[in-house]
Every structure is written in structure tokens, then in C-alpha cells.
Amino acid sequence: MQPRGGKIVRVRAGKSPRAFVLASVVLVSVALAWGKPAKAPAGPPEPVVAIGDVHGDYDDFVSILRRAGLIDEQNHWKGGKTTFVQTGDLLDRGPKPREVMDLMMALEKEAAQAGGRVVSLLGNHEAMNMMGDLRYVTPVNFASYADGQSEQRQKAAYEEYVKWRNGHASLLAELPQPMELTETEWMARHPAGFLEQREALGPKGEYGEWLRGHDAVAEIDGVIFLHGGIHPDFASTKLDAMNKQIRDEIKAFDASKEYLQKENLILPFFNLQEINSVLQAEVVAELKARVPANDARQAKIVEFLRHGDWLSVRVNGPLWFRGYDQWSDEEGAPQVSKLLERYKATHLVVGHTVQKGGRIRPRFGDKVFLIDTGMLSSYYYPDGKASALEICGGAKFVAVYLDQQVVLLDSTGSAPKGGAPGEHPGAGDAATVSEKPAVLPADRICSATAVAPQ
């Protein structure tokens, strides 16, 4: 018997039973293959919604999540199989960073249960808080961590600080600027909630442990998402390697800080600037004392002081780079094309730099989307506003605001009606896509129909 379109498989007499078995397996495999129905072509990718910097603006964050159709009125996930990407900077400046992180942590679980996904990426402010760079943490931020035991903890920490000062006279003499001398000064710089915030953002803290599990960059359906951007100098670095390096740097920071605490060089609540000053002074004090060198200890000190060269804190690193906003079209277009070719990607989506007019800004032939629109409007007054970027079917990019939504790039890759690439409202100018920008109901993601405003 000869299968349709196939060859006759013969087992010659005298051959081993094994040959017969193998031939039978081949026949069965061919028959099963014929019996399988044809595979349906893969459908378009599930929707992706990206939101940029939040900076503790919980209320507007909730509003834009609802507007984009990701959560319901009780703030539970309703986005189905949608992927929600937040490109970093949940923290600092605004009044409710804890509420923002609590919501993100809840949505991660709820989205996964519904077949969707929440991708929370690190921004420079997450890295700063984990490393104790507290320049943008406000008294209101600290106060949100305070509880009934905060005053007692403050007093105990101050006593520990006084004891430390008394034991480090030679070191303190080498400080370029004196540390706090009085209890009043110390309390002013360590308000209620300060100690609790440091613990919560530490490696074993509720938020610190969660943040340390996050990546800095993600690629989804050919679109690369991150906080700042990829500088051409790092184009040879794979995205996975980038994420690993930043995670390793934060781990190294935590380990060095723990070692320095055990050596009684620093206290757990010292901020980054204080640690740097103390270690620099310690190096000078040891040289002046001409004591035998403790090589292991000096190596740890030097390692810590070199953290400014780390990828996670460099100004051209993925958490800090602002080139996509600052480059001219002539300078940036070829650079972006090379980056996308290198990573076999189609677009880049970044936050970090607030866009004028509070509008999502496409650049370089609509290959880059700048999505930080200054959500914390009280800080970025008068232009700041909440926004989201919907990516539909991997080809249609839509800017979503609380009062309207605007198609920035359609499925053919051409410019929307009303302007050439880079010349629509997303660019922050006065151009318009149409006389009546499309407005969709708040509970529809990537809807095919639009309702014009009345």
C-alpha cells in the first residue's frame, strides 16, 4: 500500500525486527501528520498599554488606568490579556508613592490570573531610593511611612548616631562638611517616617524586595520599553545582559553597604551622600594615621566609591539617558535606525523626560515614543497631565488622555491625517490630527471604532 503522495516503505526479509519497528514509526508519524488540521494563522498580538512616570500621583494614575480600560471602579484588573508596561519612576515628588506601589503589586497578581501581564520597569528614581539617594524624597513621602512607633525609633537612632560620632573623631575631622551636631538638626533631616522608608526600600523591605525583582528594559512584540533609553555606546549589549548588570550592581551595592555596617564605618540609615563622604574621609584618615593597610577593607571602600561608573547610575545609562528627547532629527534618526536594527526591533518607548504640552511625542519617523507627560500636574504645572500609550496589533499607536485619544501611527506606518510624521499633537505643538480627535469610552482597549466628541 502506498500512502497518497508518499513513498512505499519496505522491510526486506532477513532484516532485524528493529528496522521493522522504525519503519512502522515512520508510517504512523506520516499518517498522524496528514490527519492534523491545518494550523490557523497567528492572530495579531494582544494589546499593550504603556504608562510613563507617575511620581507618586496616585489619583491621576488611577484615572488614566481606568481611562485606558485596565482597571474598574474598585481598582481591580479588567484588562483581560492586555500587557501593561510601566516604564519606571513610580516614586518621589508626589504625595502617595506607597499607594502607587501597592496598586502595582496587586495588579501584577490580578493581571496574571486573567491571562494578562503587568511589566513594571525600573526608573532612575527606583534605583536612587534603593541606593539611598534621597534628594527627591519629600517630607510628605517620608510621613506616609510613619506609624505610632516612629518617634521612639527616631530617638533610638539618634542615640546610635551620637555613639557613632564619638567613636569616629579622626574620620569626622576629614569630612569636607560637618555632619549634624545637634539633636534638632538631626531630627530635621530624619523626620518621622524616614527610618521606616529606608527599611521598606531596603533589600528585605516590602517595596525594596519587590523593586529588586524588576528589570530595566523589556522587549514586547518588537517594541523595546525602558525608562531613559539605550545610548549608542551600549548598542553591543544584549537586553538581557543589561538587565543582569543592573541587578548585579544593586546586589553589589547592598552587599557593600552591609559589610561597611558590620565594620562600623556607617550606620544603616546613612544616605548615599553621607556614605560617600564618610568613606572618602576614612581613606584620608587612614593615610594620615599611617596604620598598616587592611587590604580587604580598603578594597570594599574603593569598590563602593566607584559606583558612579555603574550602568545603573551613569548619565548615558538606560535609566538616565535623555538623548531621544535632546537629539536633533538629523543626529537622532540614523542612531535610532541602527539601534532598532541591532536589536531587531521596530520601536522604542521611553519615559524620564517630561514632554512640553503634556503630550506623548513621537520622534524619528515615529520610531520612538516619549511618554512622560508630567503626570504629577501639581509639580509639572501647567502642562503636566496623565497619559497612556496603546499599541494595538503591534502596529497602531494611540495616545490616550483623560479627555481624548489620538492616533499617532496607523497600521500602515503612515502619518495620521493632519500632519507628517512627528508633526501631530503628540509632538507637543499646536497641530491637530483632525478637527475632532477621536474619543473612546473608558473601558475599551484598542477599540476599532471611535466616538467623536459632541
Question: What role is predicted for each listed range?
Answer:
Residues R4-V21:
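Bacterial N-terminal signal peptides that target proteins for export
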Residues G5, V25-V26, D429:
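Low-complexity intrinsically disordered segments
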Residues F20-A31:
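Bacterial N-terminal signal peptides
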Residues L32-Q454:
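Feature recognizes metal-dependent phosphohydrolase scaffolds
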